[in-house]
Structure formats: structure tokens, C-alpha cells
């Protein structure tokens, strides 16, 4: 079990089953999780929990505000580690993300 007090991982994905899969895995390891179903909600949750989020797992393609836009806005004020989830495995997309400040990629689907 991980002993993390008042720190959260933020899981952002428009697919509820994907959020649940990631959340269940991390909770079983002892992490506290916050969730958002779109980019706008992700920014709200991030701002409401300023300084308490230790990691963001962020989907690229979402309604309202995509992962790239969320990443850009967060990088204006924070260097919190961000892992992007993407169904697109093209190298050009990964390079674009790294230029914007993403820390790592996970391709969907994953097992």
C-alpha cells in the first residue's frame, strides 16, 4: 500500500469504462483518485485541487476540450507529470505531445 496523504492522481477520459479500469487499478495499489469526463471538467478539478495532484492520466481525444488543450493550459502553471492516453499511435502525435510537455504515452487499448 502506498501512504500518500492529501495527494491525488487525476484520471481524465470521456469513456467511463476506461476511467473505471484505471481507477480500480490505482486504488488497489493505494492511490487516491479524482476523475473527470472531459477537458473542461479536468481543468476545474485541477484548479480546485491545486498542489494536491501528483499525476495526471489524460486522454487525447475528448469532447468539449481535447487533451492537447488541457495539457497546454496546465503547462502554463504546473509541471505535474502527465501521461497521455491515445488510440492514435502515430509518431508525429507523440512528438507533438512531447513538444507540449507530456511526460509519457500509453496507447489504447492496453492490457
Predicted features and spans:
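Non-catalytic signal-transmission and effector/linker regions of two-component phosphorelay proteins
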Residues: 1-10
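Active-site residues of response regulator receiver
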Residues: 59, 86
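Short amphipathic alpha-helix used as the core "switch/output" element in two-component signaling
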Residues: 44-47, 68-79
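Receiver (REC) domain active-site loop signature in two-component systems and cognate sites
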Residues: 62
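Charged docking surfaces used in two-component/phosphorelay signaling
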Residues: 20-28
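Acidic catalytic/metal-coordinating carboxylates
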Residues: 38-41, 66-69, 93
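Acidic, metal-coordinating helix/loop segments flanking the phosphotransfer/catalytic sites
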Residues: 35-55
Amino acid at each position: 500500500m502506498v501512504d500518500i496523504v492529501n495527494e491525488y492522481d487525476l484520471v481524465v477520459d470521456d469513456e467511463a469504462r476506461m476511467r473505471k479500469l484505471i481507477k480500480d487499478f490505482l486504488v488497489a495499489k493505494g492511490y487516491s483518485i479524482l476523475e473527470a469526463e472531459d477537458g473542461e471538467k479536468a481543468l476545474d478539478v485541477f484548479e480546485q485541487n491545486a498542489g494536491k495532484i501528483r499525476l495526471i492520466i489524460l486522454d487525447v481525444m475528448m469532447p468539449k476540450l481535447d487533451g492537447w488543450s488541457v495539457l497546454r493550459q496546465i503547462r502554463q502553471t504546473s509541471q505535474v507529470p502527465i501521461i497521455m492516453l491515445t488510440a492514435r499511435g502515430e509518431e508525429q502525435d507523440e512528438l507533438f505531445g512531447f513538444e507540449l510537455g507530456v511526460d509519457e504515452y500509453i496507447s489504447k487499448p492496453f492490457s
